Regions:
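N-terminal carbohydrate-binding accessory modules
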Residues: 1-69
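Aromatic- and acidic-residue-enriched segments that line the glycan-binding/catalytic groove
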Residues: 17-30, 86-89, 117-135, 177-185, ...
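Active-site beta-loop-alpha junctions enriched in small/polar residues
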Residues: 10-12, 77, 113-117, 165-168, ...
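Hydrophobic faces of well-ordered beta-strands that scaffold small-molecule active sites
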Residues: 3-9, 72-74, 108-112, 161-163, ...
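Aromatic-rich peripheral "rim/lid" segments of glycoside hydrolase catalytic domains that contact
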Residues: 305-320, 324-370
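Short acidic/His/Gly/Ser-rich catalytic and metal-binding motifs that mark active-site loops
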Residues: 80-83, 116-126, 172-175, 297-300
Length: 370
């Protein structure tokens, strides 16, 4: 497997309110499902199409390639093929993404980011506070069908790196501590919500691999998220005998700050030491990718007003993280951008560090270090 240096194209085909709040202003909703419920169908479709046409363009793929990256992770929804109204399908934009990627020498990891009734209850799962997809066999089958159709449509494209089976199926500890848990708008809809059990996930991954691999050659990679349980997979992958697979983990240092509120480099190093011990253990049986990470941290953000000191601190933390990821099979920065206008101020200073394009512009990240 090539060493991945990549970025995520989040909030393009799967919306996340915090990244572009103006899309949600007229409805005061928190996720894409409720946005679709509050707007008239035609108005919703027009809003989505305008966003997709303008949020990511060919120019972005050129920019990504010119900054020494070789892969993009592209989150796609369960309604990709336009068969779950009122949601708007997105194969038109995925097709464009492949054309642009191949033009600029990039590859794409297609990432199934949402499923009906959600796998995590996050806004990025499409329905905040609801998480019981795994309890619906018909919707589990639907997700498998989406994966198979993605493999059929894109499996032979030279720009395809691989397909990720499912983003962030939630574990018990993460579900119990997630801010979104218990925040569903419709409490009836949220009944039965809970974490995704590991036995179910192992079975789903086995079935998904078979469905994808039928249509995708072994030169393409099937990627599995660790479900926030990085060390739970060794025996499974050792016995599964899959070909060309990788495990995806999402080691965000900002998440550690919620539990250890000491924003100092030595604390981040200690946290990453623990993360890397888990990754090394997992890599005895499967390559591991840091599929989402960023340099967001309070150590740098708290001195944002001092541009020189702030930049120095972000570079310091970036080096710590990038040094760690060199031991992995590669990484994808979350996210490529937040606001389309890179000169427009974000409503919170910390959001700047989630935006790769701004990190490069601000000198917080240097492509020579990738």
């Amino acid at each position: 497997m090539k060493l991945i240096r990549g970025t995520n194209l989040g909030n393009w085909l799967v919306l996340e309110k915090w990244m572009k709040p103006d899309l949600f202003e007229s409805t005061h909703t928190e996720d894409e499902t409720w946005l679709s419920r509050k707007l008239p169908t035609d108005e919703f479709a027009a809003l989505i199409k305008k966003h997709r046409d303008t949020y990511v363009t060919e120019e972005d793929f050129r920019f990504i390639s010119e900054n020494r990256l070789n892969t993009v992770r592209l989150p796609v929804p369960y309604f990709t093929f336009g068969d779950r109204p009122p949601f708007v399908g997105c194969v038109e934009w995925i097709d464009k993404a492949f054309d642009w990627a191949e033009k600029y020498g990039l590859q794409i990891l297609l990432d199934l980011h949402t499923v009906p009734y959600s796998q995590n209850g996050y806004d990025n799962g499409g329905l905040t506070g609801v998480c019981h997809w795994y309890k619906h066999p018909d919707e589990v089958e639907f997700a498998l069908t989406v994966l198979e159709r993605l493999a059929q449509r894109y499996g032979k494209r030279p720009g395809l790196f691989g397909i990720e089976v499912l983003n962030e199926p939630i574990s018990w500890i993460v579900y119990m501590t997630a801010p979104s848990t218990g925040k569903a708008v419709d409490k009836e809809e949220a009944k039965g919500s809970g974490y995704v059990p590991l036995p179910f996930l192992r079975d789903f991954y086995t079935r998904a691999y078979a469905r994808i691999r039928k249509h995708m050659g072994e030169d393409k990679t099937v990627v599995f998220h660790d479900g926030f349980r990085c060390t739970a997979w060794n025996k499974f992958f050792r016995e599964a005998k899959f070909t060309n697979v990788a495990l995806d983990t999402h080691p965000y240092i900002f998440a550690m700050e919620n539990f250890v509120p000491i924003p100092r480099p030595w604390v981040y190093k200690l946290y990453l030491s623990g993360v890397m011990n888990q990754i090394r253990s997992a890599q005895k049986d499967i390559p591991v990718i840091a599929g989402e990470w960023c340099i967001c941290n309070k150590y740098a953000d708290k001195v944002y007003a001092d541009k020189e000191l702030c930049a120095a601190r972000y570079r310091e933390i970036a080096k710590i993280e990038l040094d760690a990821w060199r031991e992995t099979a590669g990484w994808f920065y979350w996210n490529y951008q937040l606001l389309r206008d890179r000169e427009a101020p974000t409503d919170e200073t910390w959001k700047q560090s989630w935006d790769l394009s701004r990190c490069l512009k601000n000198g917080w990240l240097d492509p020579k270090d990738f």
